[in-house]
Amino acid sequence: MRGILKKISQINFGLMSPEDIRKMSVAQIVTPDTYDEDGYPIENELMDPRLGVIGSSLRCRSCGAKGGECPGHFGSINLARPVIHVGFADTIHKILSSICRKCSRILLTETEIQDYRQRILEAMEREESLTPIIKEIYAEARRDRCPHCEEEQEEIKLDKPVSIVEGDYKLTPSEVRERLERITDNDSLLLGVNPEVARPEWMVLTVLPVPPVTVRPSITLETGERSEDDLTHKLVDILRINQRLKENMEAGAPQLIVEDLWELLQYHVTTYFDNEASGVPPARHRSGRPLKTLAQRLKGKEGRFRSNLSGKRVNFSARTVVSPDPNVSVNEVGVPELIAKEVTVPVYVTEWNIDRMKEHIENGPDVHPGANYVIRPDGRKIRAYNETKDVVLENLKPGYIVERHLKDGDIVLFNRQPSLHRMSMMAHEVRVLPYKTFRLNLCVCPPYNADFDGDEMNMHVFQTEESRAEAKTLMRVQDHILSPRFRDLSSGVYTTISQEHTSSQGKRLFSVRSRPPDPQEGRAPPPDREGREWTVKEIFSMVLPDDLNMVYLAEICRKCDECLEMDWENDAYVVIENGQLITGVIDEKAYGAFAGKILDQIVKEYGSDAAKEFLDSATKLAIAGIMHAGFTTSTNDEEIPEEAKERIEAHLRNAEARVDQLIEAYENGELEPLPGRSLEETLEMKIMQVLGEAKDKSGEIAESYFDMDENHAVIMALTGARGAMLNLTQITACVGQQSVHGGRITRGYDNRTLPHFKKGELGAKSRGFVHSSYKEDSILLEFMGGREGLVDTAIRTAQSGYMQRRLVNALQDLTVDENGRVVDNRGVIIQTRFGEDGVDPAKSDYGKIVDLDKLVQEIRLKSGK
Amino acid sequence: MKKSAWGLVDAFFDKYDLVDHHIHSYNDFVSNRIQEIIDTSEPIELEQGQYTVETGKVTIEKPFIKEADGSKSKIYPTEARLRNLTYSAHMSLEMRLLKEGGSETEFEKVHIGELPVMLKSEICHLHGLGRDELIEKGEDPADLGGYFIVNASERSIVTMEEIAPNKIILERIGEEDEKRARAIVTSIRSGFRARISLEYRKPRKTGVFLRISFPYVPGELPLVILLRALGLATDQEIITSISDDFNYQMIAADDIQVSLDKLKLDSDKMEEEMDEEERREYLIRSAIKYIGNRVAKGMTEDYRIKRAEDVIDRYLLPHIGTEPDKRLEKAVYLAEMTEMLLQVISGERKPHDKDHYTNKRLRVSGDLMEDLFRVAFTSLTRDMSYRLERSLARGKEPSVKQAVRSDVLSENLKHAIATGNWVGGRAGVSQLLDRTSYMGTLSHMRRVVSPLSRSQPHFEARDLHPTQFGKICPNETPESPNCGLVKNLALMAKISEGSDPDEIEEVIKKMGVIN
């Protein structure tokens, strides 16, 4: 068997003719039994040794190969009477409805036939889809009278799954077959059946192919009992009924009995193909479990396609819990030694690496940078046991392959499910570390959407140089710092730097002696500089490229009407000149997960490796800073003085009074409806507006009492590190209007939300305006808004997964070709230029081809103005 | 909360436990409902009524076990937990076999099965024990009970939320101007649930607007024909009992017009040969015949009529009654339901809010055990009659004691509680008691599960409804796909056990309510 190679030049899809089935059949299956008393297969039964063998002891009677090597061979069953194939019941019905019941000609006039034939041939010539033409033919070929023999036609119905009823008479499969046989080849083409590969009558089975035993292996239980595959069970049923039907027919049994058996044979053949066909009770196992027949093997998530062909289990992969480690670089992953010793990299032995490989083998499979297997050029795999390694070492020469342990610097693929976008799988460099978890840098959490509450991730080791090279050029972490969706990776670390800046205003001194902020040698700052210590801005400048120039507004910028630029006290105007941070704080805008300006600039100007360096050193700097200064928050940060509370209270009372006024106006009919709205809608909108303003205002009042320099919660909110101002004002001042399904809360008791309101009351409180803050009391209506959010997230996760699958299925074959066109797998052009503008969002400035503002600024800085 | 209110809270918890709802409900089940189920179950008849088995009182003993050596001893929960046993009680029932024309025999006490016992219920050994006694018996004195021990695993029965039975629920289908609405009653009588649904819908071509569907009738019936079959013979009777409002009367009149020829009335014969009484009889008969054609198509006419009458007596609104003399009462009920439905269509009445807690009922462990026991007991009686028949067929003297296989009932109960697969195909009714923490246990005992499917959105049902105030905890619900469908009772919520409707009726009448 081995060594016969053939190139597939084309694949034809058609139906199998009875002759085809007989031709490929190596055995006629007649008896329903499986084994004789001694447990050996009998001839002409389902386990016929000519169908192939399982288990290595036997040899196949057809090809002589041993079990495991013999692919198996088909057999066949001659059916005593023809039966309809469930899969084609619909097609048969369609064809029968479009042909004459007497002469089996298609129900079209000669001219129509000519016309359609022409069109079909033309379409075939042009390799276009025939579906629309065939559809049209079927719609057209519905006549009450045959144009060829003038026969009156009767309506044909399909009684699911396989009964075909004409008027009141149920056609037998034989009659169906006869009609289909009479169709001429010419007509058959018009009906969408290409006579070169299929004949319509082949949809009614007269011979049933029997799959080889390798397809339906029986298993031997510990008790020595044999347990057959579901398919074998089903085939036994078919054979038994077939046998009885044959005997009855030969004995000349009454028509009724023959028909009953025929019906039964049809049922068994139907369930053999599809045990979930609508309209038939599923065939069951003795235990009551429905049998898993052919269609069930292929269908659905656990079916052959989705489970074994689109997705496979692989070797050389590892999975464990992830945990954070800031000392691992963004493009690295910490791999436990235990895993590193298990998953291996195959290395070709050459003259140049043979010594190193020998060292690996010397270490053996149990000592870390060792090797597990050696593959000889003849393909034999030898395990590098401690006992055998001497022999192996002796024989080792170029051409051997050594499967050595994973070690530092290897490239691996790292992945976290759900793999929603391409950044869910990235290439990392290995760092072998102790303990049992994968360690990853905090900055790569956002693209993987990973946290450390027990998340697990997968690692795959490349097994070929080609895959490794491909991953290195396309999949490395640093190449994905800017991506179509995420502007960049990191989040959460900027707090410290910005915080130090705001509090120091560039004056307070901050010394980093114990840990140099930049791992690169030679750039570590000397402990003293011109007789004074370093400022934070100077230290941060150390991680910036030397010739970086940029100007932007930081996240903390309040967007004043007139920009004070450098003079503003909060230091929101960031100026970097020649790699020196002159003014401004470093916050989310610098290198946040979506907005990072500096990081963005570095990626584009200095390349992704420089960006990686920047990200790593800035993170380390931030950690050093935070270890130095400490940073914490408590509920005291959300405390405001009594005076502020009174002001807020007064303000809210005022707003509620205004709502009451609106309601009064509405009740008196004085309210003017807004254009396009009913009176009720107008009132709702106005109330919502008043209450929204009230909440914002009360928030503003609370905000004005917050101390921006010392209040850590506020710093986090303003720099964009964590939390938003809204959270803080809700905690201190006023929670605000709760909304359910986009409006105020209306559901509840009869005409009121809760029984302690008046019926029909429309006021702020009764419809879910929460006057108090989170620190004060909470009321039931507050939970309603909260519940809605909870339900939304729960439902969304479930729905988005399915949507993702559909989208992926629809778009997976689209590619951008060398001309920049988007093309599907048939070569049909979807877009003439990618995205209609040919811009790669990851490599452009915010999706634009040129960022003029940035250019102007750069030129201005460079010219020294 | 005001300081003084805490006193009330303390007083409340002095009197009530957090698992009272389970224990009270189970006690009620044990002391009243088991007997009731046995009394109302269909008696066993053999050989066309030659032999009947009569049942008497049921007695339930406190849990004990029979060891392999035949000795009997009390069993405490701890022992059951440690020895992989089931904490269950012996049930015995008085039974006797009556032979037609034979003499009265004495009641025999027969062991019919084992009933899993809820901890701290009245038939539990722990009932009423003090702190020290509990510790002596190996129990955690703070443990509240309310769960079962089956094969040493602790299983609690979760409370089920369902839409209120025996109550008309009006709902609109689609938007208001689509003019479609439905009135649904889930009518329950001794465990049998019949869903009656009356729908108002514009017919596709010709046909009636008001259609009704109920169990054992394929498809839908025109309401007016059903009303006629129930005894509202003349057009006038039907129309006036539906409504006094002319507009609604017209809708009914239209339906009568449209559906008239379905009755295949012989109008000449009616006019000339019949007096008024006969005509009434004739009209009702033809309506019943029409229904008969639907429920037993292709059968003999006598059987069709019998079957039709059987169906409307037994499967239409069974909570009103299953006797033929309740038909008129059912007709009036349906007519009233129709008026309500028509009011919804015209916009005069608001449809019911399905999530309003007034339209919900909670089925606690006792209620669920009742369902289970009823089915288990029926399978016991079925097994009994099979065995009795077999011994009769062999010519042996039938004996009740030998015919009872106590395993049938025990295994049925045990299996359901052990796996959570309840009767009616519901899964997850009993769950492994959460012992993650004491609070986890308490929360599990107060859990309320809605039978709505997890996979569909059901946004409305998941929302917190203001009417849940005081009954359902607004905060505790999982964040999983079950969000809002799995709820927990509010800390101070109690569940009442329900009372005899006749008793209540009497009280209300005494208070001066007429009709």
UniProtKB/Swiss-Prot annotation, chain A:
Q: Where in the cell is it found?
A: Cytoplasm
Recite the UniProt keywords alphabetically.
Cytoplasm, DNA-binding, DNA-directed RNA polymerase, Magnesium, Metal-binding, Nucleotidyltransferase, Transcription, Transferase, Zinc
**GO cellular component terms given for this protein:** cytoplasm; DNA-directed RNA polymerase complex
Q: What's any GO biological process attached to this entry? A: DNA-templated transcription
Binding residue positions for Mg(2+)? D451, D453, D455
Look at the named UniProt entry and state the broad enzyme category this protein falls under: transferase
Keyword DNA-binding recorded: yes
Supply the NCBIfam families for this chain.
Answer: PRK08566.1 (NF006336), RNA_pol_rpoA1 (TIGR02390)
Q: Give the family per the record.
A: Belongs to the RNA polymerase beta' chain family.
Q: What does this protein do?
A: DNA-dependent RNA polymerase (RNAP) catalyzes the transcription of DNA into RNA using the four ribonucleoside triphosphates as substrates. Forms the clamp head domain.
State the name under which the record lists this protein.
Answer: DNA-directed RNA polymerase subunit Rpo1N
According to its UniProt entry, this protein's organism is Methanothermobacter thermautotrophicus (strain Winter) (Methanobacterium thermoautotrophicum)
- Identify the gene encoding this protein: rpo1N
Curated annotation (Swiss-Prot), chain B:
EC main class here is transferase
The protein's GO terms of the molecular function aspect are:
DNA binding; DNA-directed RNA polymerase activity; ribonucleoside binding
The residue ranges crossing the membrane are none
Q: Which InterPro entries match?
A: DNA-dir_RNA_pol_su2, RNA_pol_bsu_protrusion, RNA_pol_Rpb2_2, RNA_pol_Rpb2_2_sf, RNA_pol_Rpb2_3
**Entries under Pfam families matching the protein:** RNA_pol_Rpb2_1, RNA_pol_Rpb2_2, RNA_pol_Rpb2_3
Would you name any one GO CC term? DNA-directed RNA polymerase complex
User: What is the protein's major site of localization?
Assistant: cytoplasm
Q: Which reaction does it catalyse?
A: RNA(n) + a ribonucleoside 5'-triphosphate = RNA(n+1) + diphosphate
Query: Its Enzyme Commission number?
Result: 2.7.7.6
Task: Give me any GO biological process, just one.
Answer: DNA-templated transcription
UniProt keyword list: Cytoplasm, DNA-binding, DNA-directed RNA polymerase, Nucleotidyltransferase, Transcription, Transferase
Domain of life, source organism: Archaea
What is its subcellular localisation?
A: Cytoplasm
Q: Which family does it belong to?
A: Belongs to the RNA polymerase beta chain family.
Quaternary structure per UniProt?
Answer: Part of the RNA polymerase complex.
What is the documented function of this protein? DNA-dependent RNA polymerase (RNAP) catalyzes the transcription of DNA into RNA using the four ribonucleoside triphosphates as substrates. The Rpo2 subunit (Rpo2N and Rpo2C in this organism) is implicated in DNA promoter recognition and in nucleotide binding.
Q: What is this protein called?
A: DNA-directed RNA polymerase subunit Rpo2N
Question: What gene is this protein translated from?
Answer: rpo2N
